Every structure is written in structure tokens, then in C-alpha cells.
Design a protein with these regions (language model features):
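Bacterial N-terminal signal peptides
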Residues: 1-9
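N-terminal alpha-helical modules
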Residues: 11-126
Length: 126
């Protein structure tokens, strides 16, 4: 059974090197988004840790505003809502058709990679 699963995974990976059908393209777009999301989650952990550490270095005894991490978390939650709504809207170009999931996944992958770069830059410049 394990050998079959490995074979199927390898076959799916090979398909994404040169997808030929709409189904293949949709599957590959989903995998691309999943990979981008994994990268985002890894970068989020790095950036969040950095911002928490930065917050701890500040004297906020006279400052009641939220800290760096708290505002970043709020922004990230808003960004996730934006990304999902925006990409759902982008998919409506082919609403109900077989192209819709490909458009949504491709949009999510693109925006997720852009956000990952933003988070990386935040961690590197602060």
C-alpha cells in the first residue's frame, strides 16, 4: 500500500511538470497554493517571533497602544480575509465551471507568495 501511495504521489508530481488537462492544471494549482501556504506559515512563525521579541525591548510604560505583534496579528487576520474574498471573486470569472478552482488556487498562491515576501521583509528590517 505504501508503495502505491508513493507511486501516485510521484506520478502527480510529474504531471505538474507539464500538465496537459484541465484536471491536471487544477490539481497542480492546488498543490502550488498548498506549497505557498506552507511557506507563508513558516515565515509567519519567524516574523511573529521577531515582533514579539522586538515588543519586549520597548519601554511601553507610557504607551497604551497595541504592540508590534498585536497589530501584525490583526493585519494578518485581515489579510487572510481579503485574500480569500478577493480570490473567490477572481474565480467568478468562470463561476461554476471547471476553470473556477484553478483561478482561485492560482490567485491564492500568488497573493500568498507576495504576503510571504512582505513578512520576510518585516522580519529583516526591524
Amino acid at each position: 500500500m505504501t508503495g502505491l501511495l508513493f507511486f501516485l504521489g510521484a506520478a502527480a508530481s510529474a504531471v505538474c511538470d507539464d500538465p496537459q488537462t484541465q484536471t491536471d492544471m487544477t490539481i497542480c494549482a492546488g498543490k502550488d497554493y498548498a506549497a505557498a501556504d506552507e511557506e507563508l506559515n513558516a515565515q509567519w512563525a519567524i516574523t511573529a517571533k521577531h515582533m514579539k521579541e522586538y515588543d519586549n525591548t520597548l519601554d511601553r510604560s507610557h504607551d497604551t497602544r497595541p504592540g508590534y505583534f498585536e497589530t501584525l496579528l490583526k493585519a494578518q487576520r485581515a489579510w487572510l480575509s481579503y485574500r480569500d474574498a478577493h480570490c473567490t471573486s477572481a474565480g467568478y470569472y468562470a463561476r461554476g465551471g471547471s476553470l473556477e478552482p484553478l483561478l482561485v488556487s492560482s490567485c491564492k498562491a500568488e497573493l500568498t507568495r507576495e504576503r510571504t515576501a512582505q513578512l520576510r521583509e518585516l522580519a529583516e528590517t526591524n
